[in-house]
Amino acid sequence: MSAPAREPIPSLEVDPALALSPTPAAPIHRSGRWIDHWDPEDPTFWRGGGRRVARRNLALSVYAEFLGFCVWALWSVVVPLLPGAGFSLTLDQQFWLIAVPSLVGATIRIPYTFAVPRFGGRNWTIASALLLLVPAAALAVVVTRPGTSFGVLLACAALAGVGGGNFASSMANISFFFPEAEKGKALGLNAAGGNLGTGIVQMVVPAVIAVGAGIHLERAGLVFIPLALLAAVLAWRGMDNLSGARADYRSFAVAAHNRHTWIISFLYIGTFGSFIGYSSAFPTLLKTQFPEVTTSIAFVGALVGALSRPLGGMVADRFGGARVSIASFGLLTAGAVGAIRGLQGHSFPVFFSAFMVLFLGAGIGNGATYRMIPAVFRAGVDREHLATARKAAAGCIGIAGAVGAYGGFLIPRGFATAQKTFGSLVPALWVFVVAYLLMAAVTYAVYQRRGAALAAETI
C-alpha cells in the first residue's frame, strides 16, 4: 500500500534545556528506558541508531493502537447477536450500546494526548494496553448472563471507549520520534494500522465465537485479553520514553481561538465520524433490515473505509485537500441516497453497494480533510511565523480528531431516533444527506470560492 499524505502532528516538542545539551551520535538509555537526548533532525544521530529506535517504537505502537480500535469496535460485532443469546433489547437500546463507546472514546482523546508527555510514551502505552483488559473482561462476563440489566450492559459498552483514546496518545507519541521529512509517512502508517482494527475485528470475531457447537459470545472479549497483555509486554520490553517531550498546551490554546479549527472539526465529523459511525452501525443495520443476509460480510465496509484513507491523502496531495473533501462529500451524499433507495425497495444489493460508496467516501474524505489542516494554517504565513502556524496546526489536529470521533456516536443515535420516531431509517439518511451537502458547501465557500481569503492557496 502506498504511503499516505504527510500528516504532521507535532503535539510534543523538545524541552529547550535538553535541546541545548550536546547530542550523542546514538540514543543513550537510562533506567526505565528513558532517553534524555533525542534529535532526529541530526543526520548523524538518525543514522547512528535513531532511525532503528524510532521504527521499533512505531511498530509496537501500531500493534497497541490496532488493538485499541478492535476493542473500541467490539460491541458493534456483539450487539446484533445479543437477542439470539437471550437478551431482550429494543432496537433503540441496541443502538445505544453501539454508540456509547464512540462517545467515551471521543471525550478522552485530548486527555490521552497529554498523558504521553506526563507519563512517557512507553509507560502510557503499557498502561493503555492494560486498560483494554477491563472492557474485554467485562464483555466476556456480561454476555453470558441474559438477565443483565440494560444499565449494566451500557456501562460495560462505555468501558470499550478507552480503545478510542489510544489513537490520540499513539499519534502524539510517534510524532516526536521522527524527523519532519519522515513524520508524515510514519503517522500515516500508525493511523492506518489503527483504522484497520475496526474491519479486522468485524471479520475475525464472528468466526472466533462460532467455533465449535453453538455461539460463544464471551470469546469476543476473552480473545483480546492475551493480545492486550502481549501489547503491554512488548511495550515494556521494546518501547522508549523521551524525557525531552513535554505537553504543548499553547498549541491547543492557539488552535481553539482560530475559526478554521472549528470549521475543520465540523468537516471531520462528516469524514472520520462517518467512518466510525457507519462501521459501528453496519452489522446491526444488516441484521435488522436484511435478516435473511449474514452479518459476517459487514467487515468489508470498515476495510474499504480504512484502506481508502491513504488514497484520500495521496489524491489530496495532488489536487488539494479541499477539492478532494468536496468530492468525498459528494460520494457520501450519493451513498446515502442509494441506501435510501435500497431500504425503500428492500434491495440488499443496492443497499450494500450504497454503503460501500459511503465507506469509500468517508475513507477518502478522512485522508483529504486531514491533509487540509497543515495547509490551512501554513497558508499566507511568512517564515518568521511558521513555527506558530505549526503549533496551531498541531492543536487543530488534536481538537479535530476528538470532535470528529463524536460522529461515531451521532450516526447510530440518528438511526435509532429515526426508527423510534418514524418507524424507518430513511429520515436519518436524509438528515445525513443534508449534512453532507452543507459540509461540501462550507468547504467550497471557505476554501475554494473565488474571492474567499484562502481561495488562492492550495488547500
Regions picked out by a protein language model, each given a short descriptive name:
Residues R56-F87, Y278-P283, I411:
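Extracytoplasmic
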Residues L154-G193:
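Cytoplasmic helix-loop-helix junction between adjacent transmembrane helices
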Residues G184-P206, I397-I411:
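Glycine-rich segments within core transmembrane alpha-helices of 12-TM secondary carriers
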Residues W96-F114, F299-G312:
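Central cavity-lining transmembrane alpha-helices of secondary-active solute carriers
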Residues L130-P146, G330-H346:
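C-terminal ends and interior cores of transmembrane alpha-helices
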Residues W75-P80, N258-A306, P310, Y370, ...:
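Extracytoplasmic gate region of multi-pass secondary transporters
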Residues N190-D240:
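Helix-loop-helix hairpin linking two adjacent transmembrane segments in secondary transporters
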Residues S149-G165, V350-N366:
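Hydrophobic core of transmembrane alpha-helices in multi-pass small-molecule transporters
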